[in-house]
From Swiss-Prot:
Sequence positions bearing Phosphothreonine: T337
Alphabetized PANTHER family for the sequence: NIBRIN, NIBRIN-RELATED
Maturation and modification: Ubiquitinated at Lys-436 via 'Lys-6'-linked ubiquitin chains by RNF8, promoting NBN recruitment to DNA double-strand breaks (DSBs). Ubiquitinated at Lys-684 and Lys-688 via 'Lys-63'-linked ubiquitin chains by PELI1: ubiquitination takes place following PELI1 phosphorylation and promotes ATM activation and DNA repair. Ubiquitinated at Lys-733 via 'Lys-63'-linked ubiquitin chains by the SCF(SKP2) complex: ubiquitination takes place following SKP2 phosphorylation and promotes ATM activation and DNA repair. Phosphorylated by ATM in response of ionizing radiation, and such phosphorylation is responsible intra-S phase checkpoint control and telomere maintenance. Phosphorylated at Ser-433 by CDK2 in S/G2 phases abolishes interaction with TERF2, enabling DCLRE1B/Apollo recruitment to telomeres. Phosphorylation at Ser-433 in response to dysfunctional telomeres promotes non-homologous end joining repair at telomeres, while dephosphorylation by PPP1CA promotes microhomology-mediated end-joining (MMEJ) repair.
Top-level taxon: Eukaryota
Localization, UniProt: Nucleus; Chromosome; Nucleus, PML body; Chromosome, Telomere
Function: Component of the MRN complex, which plays a central role in double-strand break (DSB) repair, DNA recombination, maintenance of telomere integrity and meiosis. The MRN complex is involved in the repair of DNA double-strand breaks (DSBs) via homologous recombination (HR), an error-free mechanism which primarily occurs during S and G2 phases. The complex (1) mediates the end resection of damaged DNA, which generates proper single-stranded DNA, a key initial steps in HR, and is (2) required for the recruitment of other repair factors and efficient activation of ATM and ATR upon DNA damage.
Name this polypeptide is given: Nibrin
Organism: Mus musculus (Mouse)
Region (Disordered), start-end ranges: 389-418, 444-479, 491-550, 576-645, 731-751
Motif extent (Nuclear localization signal): 461-467
InterPro entries reported in the protein's UniProt record: BRCT_dom_sf (IPR036420), FHA_dom (IPR000253), Nibrin-rel (IPR040227), Nibrin_BRCT2 (IPR032429), Nibrin_BRCT2_sf (IPR043014), Nibrin_C (IPR013908), Nibrin_met (IPR016592), SMAD_FHA_dom_sf (IPR008984)
Region named Interaction with MTOR, MAPKAP1 and RICTOR: 221-403
Amino acid sequence: MWKLLPAAGAAPGEPYRLLAGVEYVVGRKNCGILIENDQSISRNHAVLTVNFPVTSLSQTDEIPTLTIKDNSKYGTFVNEEKMQTGLSCTLKTGDRVTFGVFESKFRVEYEPLVVCSSCLDVSGKTVLNQAILQLGGLTANNWTEECTHLVMSAVKVTIKTICALICGRPIIKPEYFSEFLKAVESKKQPPDIESFYPPIDEPAIGSKSVDLSGRHERKQIFKGKTFVFLNAKQHKKLSSAVAFGGGEARLMAEDDEEEQSFFSAPGTCVVDVGITNTQLIISHSQKKWIHLIMDTLQRNGLRPIPEAEIGLAVIFMTTENYCNPQGQPCTELKTTTPGPSLSQVLSANGKIIPSAPVNMTTYVADTESEPADTCMPLSERPEEVKIPGLEQSSRKLSQETFNIKEAPKPSSKANNVASDTLVRGKTPSYQLSPMKFPVANKNKDWTSQQQQNSIKNYFQPCTRKRERDEDNPELSSCKSSRMELSCSLLEQTQPAGPSLWKSKEHQSQNATLDREADTSSVGGMDIELNRKSPDRKPLPTETLRPRKRKDVDLATEEEVLEELLRSTKPELAVQVKVEKQEADDTIRKKPRMDAERNRPLNGGSEPESNSALQEDEREKKDELQTESWSTKHEIANSDGLQDSSEELPRKLLLTEFRSLVVSNHNSTSRNLCVNECGPLKNFKKFKKATFPGAGKLPHIIGGSDLVGHHARKNTELEEWLKQEMEVQKQQAKEESLADDLFRYNPNVKRR
């Protein structure tokens, strides 16, 4: 940075440090550089400016330029030569500057300020560069002999640290230059540099007391030693530190012909390559050559020198324990000196590499399309029912894993809920048999809680699309959730009559699976699969239910259902209460169109009860079951299964899924609000807000609306302005007369 110092023999004074980008005015009153007791100094005598472009901030061979401009009456002299008034001149370090004709003499000097930083983050480097730029200094990326300071937040053993210690340069914190800049701006003394020494943060040093100040012993620490490098990367990294310490760095290649006595000569230190380092790429022949040199050293009782010993020898200022081939290796040395630092190499090499192969075998469900998306034949379904409890739970878990794996995974909780729903939809045969659900024999509280959760689970978003929705767009998700709800409600009533269901199951196993398995989604998926691939063999006629027995089975199922409802009245009271709380809104909003259109199958079959509460609960239960059975009956008689094609199976049931959510109907029913007085129009309607000028033309001001403005003359203001002008003219005349009195020209030529 530039400084303006009083010349020898002149009046003593403090040096002026000049910041970059600031104009310093030299004068005798109200200026940056004040010179008093000199009548030849003008008020604005000269201007000093330091210009420092940002582009050359990292170029250590360029220094900022200092220019001076003369604005005085009696002149400014540079090296005893008078400057021309109004022109600028570039100053060099050591130039003598005289302001006026008396003893106001100064000299300018440039104090080098080249800063090198190490282990600083991006924000720290930005703040440091701004402070160095204002101080007129330079920044360097690599350490050179011109560097004056090393900036580190914490001392680590790096190449820059070793070079700074050898060159005797101070290692300081980045906050030092911020405080130095504030002191220059306020014209105070610079801060003490010793109070800005950073702490030592290096595991290789530990808690030992280390003197990091500039010591002369470090400049000749490697004098008389020759460091032999067997790797070019090591030579490039450490050769500068060896050269600064007075030693010689030599790079040896495989082609060089040197006698074996050269490596064992006194003062020769062979730097250990570190073949185990994964960052080094060494060929097989080079490894063989390195092993040959190491064997030579071992035969002579010598050892290779690790990289880190070069830095430790500089820090502790000794070569007896470090960098000594004849000495014992340091046991406390655990790391090598890396390029950036000891700590940074750990993070650079910290790649996770497994030492041994780990058994990562994972058992998942079969993900082939046909076993996952299709179903088993109806004759094989009873074998699946007879799975024990443990295998059944593991099978459910594997199906849940398979569903979650294909899902986009919005959250773990949502995936679990959705996977349970998908498992229930895929294997609905578990829902109607009491032998497949031993969990239903628990207490009533758990049963009601399970029913409440099952109702809630139908409104969770599904994370995986079903193939049957893509193949058959006629089946909607609303129908599926509605059908699943009816099945789950029937599931809650099964512990009352296990013997009835068992006898019913034995009767239906002679021909095919029971009626409940036919109403599951498996049957629907079989029909859709056969429709999709006609070349598949149709099911044998022995497994199909005859048409004449359809009505008999329906009547039998109605009787079984009535027996279950009579035997489970206490449980229904608890279950319907929970059902009423959770599904009251959705059931109340559901249209009654399906129930009115279809013939009810079990209406009026139950006996009347004395309690009004049980009647309401039974009506709600019958309504849900009526819709589910009427849906089955309607789908069974639908035209979709009466296809004339011989390839498709006939006399089967198609499962249709119903939803508790009401679909959007015509808009007229929504716009009408039913009241006691009749239908009223919906009052929650909004109309567009009108904007200015929408209905008529805007009102334009003009013509007679404009009134002319006549300015009146203010005589008092004019008189005051005239008086001020006269006062200013009088003051100017007085100042010119005063300047004429102080004019002195000793070189006036007389005629």
